[in-house]
């Protein structure tokens, strides 16, 4: 197996059974904040343009580069698709021209043309942009695990695919914390030191658990070339900086008694066999070392090459074109109204300072209104041009744009609250309902509601929509109006697919008069479903809003039981 490192998390894997292009990233990301480090400007893109397979682990822009994928990768390529509950990644890939997809199941190996592959998918709201994944590859001679920046939880599943000969993984920071927070200097230093230590220790723990013979640090760090962010770079191995480079992690591994790490830079080619891993760099060894020992000089030259590009991107941001308050009120309030568990998790005010516009997201009243100095738990200060951009383009995941850009300031009172950031990545009804359903399923008791003489599970078995809000019942058929999936109340049978089932239970006649409303375990009254427009109870045999078509997929066999 031959593996060309193409920068950041990017790999081009060549085997006798075919090639796989993984997470290619070339263009700046997050409002021109992130650039690949070291630079991959000299990669010959034509050599990686015709892979047999493409693997994009998730939708973060340092992994999913739509401009590169659209302009440089053959659309005859088959995409290896992770098992995500929402089809956001597939939609993004279709938007740039891909039409051939191999859909995988989480943790289930598949053999294609002599290659044995497995994608391990993480699907919690906190996992990437509602999904992150790693790829295991076995070419019959050696096995590798491309973890990139995913955080797998089922390590036994990964072990069953192994043992592994090589392991590619993230070790460095990929977040805005703590730099954007307005902390005192000593506190900032302590938090940065703790974050850096935790990153390195977590990566080392993963290497021990996976147990690969060879370890290659990847998926970071990026570099920051805009003057506004330039100080975030770790120029001198600062123990308080959250962006240590590859050489820092390799030294850390050696200090912990693990000398099996290998440095790869863009253009490096590794040849992996059962007897070793030989890396050839695209430049002399002393030049490779200089990238890291003279990082200030290297980044100064890199910055000079990108200065005009950064200026052009910043000049393109809209300014004064959008009524921010009115737009966010129209956009956010319907979402907040449906975000019962998210709102309960936030349980406070979030203030957004957008220059002349200062507004409150009030998760008590589920309203958006001008800020008049009220107390808050979270405070964000944004360049209003960035918020205008997000509104103009109706960006449904702000984490994947403005937050990862690090182009903001923040304050918070108390501990980190994941519900706040998860709300900002769920700015569509589909995304929000998935997150709400995920939270609900983690509750100790599954909530039921009552309608038309039945007790019914509250969350749709398809993508977890809240059926107390999105169900329409007619002629004994419940239709989830979010995606159009239908279920027979008498049996719970799904009429759209034969691999899902809705829990239903008839209510005894003597109970129905007393049960005018269902009550949640926390005491909140569940409302009856809102009336939804319908054309009748005609049966749909597919989902019209996502990729799922049951006619294309056989019924799944039951498996044995077995920030910051």
Task: Show the residue positions of the predicted features.
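Active-site metal-binding motif and surrounding structural segment of the metallo-beta-lactamase
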Residues: 33-80, 160-190, 399, 474-479, ...
